[in-house]
Amino acid sequence: MENKAMYLHATVSDRDSSSIFEEPFDGRSLSKLNLCEDGPCHKGRAGGCCTQLGSLSALKHAVLGLYLLVFLILVGIFILAVSRPRSSPDDLKALTRNVNRLNESFRDLQLRLLQAPLQGELSEQVWKAHDALQNQSDSLLALAGAVQRLEGALWGLQAQAAQSEQAVVLLRERAAQQSDAAQLELYQLQVDSNRSQLLLRRHAGLLDGLARRVGALSDELADVGGALRGLNLSLSYDVALQGTRLRDLRVLVSNASEDARRLRLAHRGLELQLKQELAVLNGVTEDLRLKDWEHSIALRNITLAKGPPGPKGDPGDAGKEGEPGIPGLPGLRGLPGERGTPGLPGPKGDEGKLGATGPMGMRGFKGDRGPKGEKGEKGDRTVDASGVEAVMVRLVNGSGLHQGRVEVYHERRWGTVCDDGWDKKDGDVVCRMLGFPGAEDVHRTAQFGQGTGRIWMDDVACKGTEESIFRCSFSKWGVTNCGHAEDAGVTCKRH
C-alpha cells in the first residue's frame, strides 16, 4: 500500500516537474489505485490482503496528488491563455467546462471521503472511488486532447502572429517610404511655391515698371499733342501769311505783265521808228553811193580804220529816279528756337468755311469795227527786212569786216553770243546776214577778245537755211550760264 502510494506520489511529482506540452497526461495510471490488483489476494476481494491495504492515508495522498495535478494543469492553461494572443473561443469554453466538471467531481469525491465511516463499507467506497477516478481519467484524457488541440491552435496563432508582424514590418517600411516620398514631394511643392512667388514678384515689378513707362509715355504724348497743336497753329498762320504773300505776288505779277505789255508796245513803236530811220539812212547811203562811189569807198575805209580813242566826255546829267522795284522774295525761315513751356490750351476755334470759287468772267463782245481811215501819203522806199536784221548783227575786233566777235543788238544795247553749240551752220547764217556767201570758220572761247555787257543768246542751234540768226532756236533773251570767256566768233568767206 505504501509502495503504491509512493509510486503514485512520484508519478504526480514527475508530472508536476514536466511540461504538459512535452508529455500528455495519461489518466490510465490512476487505475493503480486498485490495491488488490498486484497482491496475492487479487482473486478474492473479501480477504485479509484487501483489508491490510485499505489504508485511508494512501487514498488521501492519491486525492491530494490528483488535486495538485489538476491545479498545475489549470495554472498552465491560464499561463498559456494569458501569454498567447487570441485563442479560439470555442476551445476555451470547452476547456473551461471540462475543468469545472473535474472540480465538481473532485469536490464530490472529497466530501464522500470525509463523510465515509472508518470501519464499515470501506472497500465499497474504495471501489467507488476507483470507478470515479477511472471516469475522471477519461475526462482528463479528453481534457489533454483538448489541451493539445488548443496548443496546436496556439502554435498556428503564433505563426499567424509572426506573419502579421512581418506584414506589419513591411507596412511600416512602406509607410516610411511613402512618408519619405510625401516629404520629398512636399519639399518640391515648397520649392515650386517659392519659385512661383519669386516669379510673381518679378512680374509685379515688371508690371509696375510698365505702368510707369505707360504713364510717362502718355505724358510725352500729351506734350507732343500740345506741340503739334502749337505747330499746327503756327503752320496755319504761316500758310495764311504765304497765301497773303502769294496774292501780293499775283498782283505784282499782273502789274509786271501790264508793264511788260506797255514796254512791248513802246518797243514796237521804237522798232518802227528805228526801221524808218534805218530806211532813211539806207536811202541816204544809197544816194551817197550813187553820187560819189569813190567818196563812199573812201568813207568806208575811213569807217573801218580804227582811230585813236577820243577824249573822255563830260559826265552826263543824272537820270530820272526809277520806279520802285518789285518787293524781294521772303528770306529763308530761321532756325527754330528753344522749346518754350507749353501754354494752356486755348478754346477751340470755329472752323471757317471755304470760300466759293468765283465764276469765270464772260468773254467780252467783239467791238465794232472802226471807221475807215483816210488814205495816207506815199511813203518812202521800203527796205528789205533782212537788211534791217543785218543792221542788228556786227563783227567786232576782227582784222576786217569779214571776221570778229559776234554781237547782236537787243533792248537798245549790244550783247555777245555764247559758244555753247556754236558751229559752222550758225556761222553761215551770220555771214549771210552781213552779205557774205557763208562762213569760212567759226571760233570759240573769246578768240577775238571778251565782250562787255549782256550775253543775249545761248545754245544757238541753226539749221543753216535761216535768213536771220534770230529765227534759229536758242534760249531766251539774256538767259545763259556762260561768261564772256566763251564769246563766239566767225570768219566769213570773201567774195
From Swiss-Prot:
Ranges for region Disordered: 303-382
Transmembrane segments: 62-82
Residue ranges the record marks as coiled coil: 92-112
Entry keywords, A to Z: Cell membrane, Coiled coil, Disulfide bond, Glycoprotein, Ion transport, Iron, Iron transport, Membrane, Receptor, Signal-anchor, Transmembrane, Transmembrane helix, Transport
Localization of this protein: Cell membrane
Extracellular side, ranges: 83-495
Membrane-topology annotation of the record: Single-pass type II membrane protein
Top-level taxon in the UniProt lineage: Eukaryota
GO annotation (BP), single: protein homotrimerization
Segments of skewed composition (Basic and acidic residues): 314-323, 365-382
Topological domain spans for side Cytoplasmic: 1-61
Short name of any one Pfam family annotated for the protein: SRCR
Every Collagen-like domain range: 306-357
Disulfide bonds: C418-C482, C431-C492, C462-C472
Chain intervals with Low complexity compositional bias: 324-342
Main location: membrane
Residues bearing glycans: N103, N135, N194, N232, N255, N301, N397
Molecular function terms from GO: ferritin receptor activity
GO annotation, cellular component aspect: cell surface; plasma membrane
Domain SRCR: 393-493
Family according to the record: Belongs to the SCARA5 family.
Quaternary structure note: Homotrimer.
Protein name: Scavenger receptor class A member 5
Lineage: Eukaryota, Metazoa, Chordata, Craniata, Vertebrata
